[in-house]
């Protein structure tokens, strides 16, 4: 069974599988679900959340719905755009005031799938206890704030380059460069198209 599979329009058992919540886009994984998860994440993790996505067809739709949920409960949103999950995790860990993150991705699943993965303040995936609390708030519902308490959203640029720079700083780039390696890269339509070419160049 695929982690996060839905039964009868809602999950049987735990909402979160081994890698977040996953389902078929515009069926199980739809805008209403993403918006409600956004509200629940804002209620559990806090009011300053970073969000990123992969390049799947449904990712922009789901990211916007999730961000709407976050904003509606008073959470401020930092939109990193399309970057790999580790780049989001590093951003959450490095920047003071960021209390968590959400990645719109279904990893290696077929293209019709998408998913929502929650990141804790230390840059790791949320604990089971945090996921259980997010699910509890999802099921119970989270009330939106008044109009003058709605959160604010920002687009954050240069995240991919910052992530690449941090990786290069951890290796002997000159040694690799002098080796004269010839590398063939296939990003396979994934998020790494935003970072891997920069890294190899």
Language model region names:
Residues 4-74, 79, 99, 152-183:
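An N-terminal, well-structured beta->alpha segment
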Residues 11, 24, 114-201:
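Gly/Ser/Thr-enriched, mixed-charge loops and adjacent short helices
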Residues 52, 103-107, 186:
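Short beta-strand segments
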Residues 54-61, 109-110, 189-193:
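Gly/Ser/Thr-rich loops at beta-strand to alpha-helix junctions
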Residues 69, 90-95:
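Short, well-structured alpha-helical segments in soluble
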Residues 80-89:
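Short acidic loop-to-helix transition motifs that present clustered carboxylates
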Residues 99-109, 115:
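Hydrophobic or amphipathic alpha-helical targeting/insertion segments
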């Amino acid at each position: 069974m695929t982690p996060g599979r839905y039964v009868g329009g809602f999950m049987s058992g735990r909402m979160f599988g081994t890698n977040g919540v996953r389902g078929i886009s515009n069926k199980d994984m739809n805008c209403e679900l993403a918006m409600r998860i956004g509200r629940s994440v804002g209620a559990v993790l806090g009011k300053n959340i970073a969000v990123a996505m992969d390049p799947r067809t449904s990712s922009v739709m789901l990211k916007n719905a999730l961000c709407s949920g976050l904003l509606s409960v008073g959470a401020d949103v930092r939109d990193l755009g399309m970057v790999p999950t580790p780049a989001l995790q590093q951003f959450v860990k490095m920047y003071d005031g960021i209390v968590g993150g959400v990645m719109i991705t279904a990893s290696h699943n077929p293209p019709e799938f998408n998913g929502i993965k929650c990141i804790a303040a230390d840059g790791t995936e949320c604990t089971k206890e945090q996921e259980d609390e997010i699910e509890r708030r999802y099921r119970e519902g989270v009330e939106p704030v008044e109009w003058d308490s709605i959160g604010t959203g920002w687009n954050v640029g240069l995240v991919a380059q910052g992530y690449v720079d941090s990786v290069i700083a951890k290796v002997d780039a000159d040694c690799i460069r002098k080796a004269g390696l010839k590398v063939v890269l296939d990003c396979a339509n994934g998020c790494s198209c935003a970072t891997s070419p920069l890294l190899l160049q």
